[in-house]
């Protein structure tokens, strides 16, 4: 078939008429300076606060400073090859991370990309990293417990679902160990866990992940990682990314627990970004909004009511409340809790667990100082049996601390004082607990009952540990149904009291330790 010139020209005209040029308008700017992960861009007139800016090489920066003729942005990722004169453009989007059940059991970076070598993440959607916390009307009071598995914490400093409880102490006092054991104890509780590691060594995080896997808790946990070698921007954003992943469960009528390990390093990363952006420094060179940095994060941990969940899920989930419980960690310098960041976070949270290096070095682990540790709202969430049995423990320890200080100067003590000192020493010994060995409510209750009712009076101090181990082995073998009943109901009445008394009487009469 041959075409003449007229037909060819007609075909060309038809094609030209059909051709549709799609014009895409985008806001483009030019990098005018690059320094330590912070870039200054000229020409982005319509840029939003917190907007993602597309950089060459499939990377992004986040706009944090909007000035008269330029935009200051932090680069999320490597920045060594960025140079002045490079073209960048606005995306019109704010930062979002993948959320959903598919992230459980995975290790991801701040942007939600997998770093565990197990293939792509199967997410249910994306959520904005920055979100407004639920309002007062959407919240419900805290009245259900989160069991950490530690006798010292669950008895004296109880934590409720939706609470923010600070874990504070010097380095090497067992802060991360306490948080990891709390995650391990949620294996069978139905609470989903998120562990956010900020500014830590990759080897340390690898150990944590391995321990969670060994104890069967990784399948229930999302690990969000921003290592010490990553940019300050990623360390600053990691807690918000982890929080968005936790809110997915909270807003669908489920319970979640999030650990921020630790917020001191996030504050340092934010200080670095702020100083590079030339924001005015304040106390300890932190910027003026460092309080807001943590308050807007921790206020997102809440117990939300059934109406909120129903409205959020558009009626799919009815009659269920959701919660996100936060355990932020703060590292102090030489026990100074009056420094800027520690005082900020203490004032934001609903209580704190204070870990002391003196107690840790004395072999009292967990090194909880019950004198200045407090839970402001957890008491309402404590199980009935723990509430009944733990009151005397706190009193005994308070009296012991007072008398121990006094007894250093007094040589002759009366019998009542000696008994109080002896009881205090034994309770302190009883509250010691090994790492990765969380205890159930029933086991804790039995041990506290023994201390409360004077069953330790004739047990030598050195044998308290073996007494406890033998007692727990005895009840697991011969009284498993009662333990199960206490674990399920958490109740306390005359019948349960009588049974516990009977168990301890028969144990002391027939068993050795």
Curated annotation (Swiss-Prot):
EC code: 7.1.2.2
Keywords: ATP synthesis, ATP-binding, Cell inner membrane, Cell membrane, CF(1), Hydrogen ion transport, Ion transport, Membrane, Nucleotide-binding, Translocase, Transport
Localization per Swiss-Prot or TrEMBL: Cell inner membrane
Annotated PROSITE patterns: ATPASE_ALPHA_BETA
Binding positions for ATP per the UniProt entry: 169-176
Primary role: Produces ATP from ADP in the presence of a proton gradient across the membrane. The alpha chain is a regulatory subunit.
Protein name: ATP synthase subunit alpha
Species whose genome carries this gene: Salmonella typhimurium (strain LT2 / SGSC1412 / ATCC 700720)
Lineage: Bacteria, Pseudomonadati, Pseudomonadota, Gammaproteobacteria, Enterobacterales
Gene symbol of the encoding locus: atpA
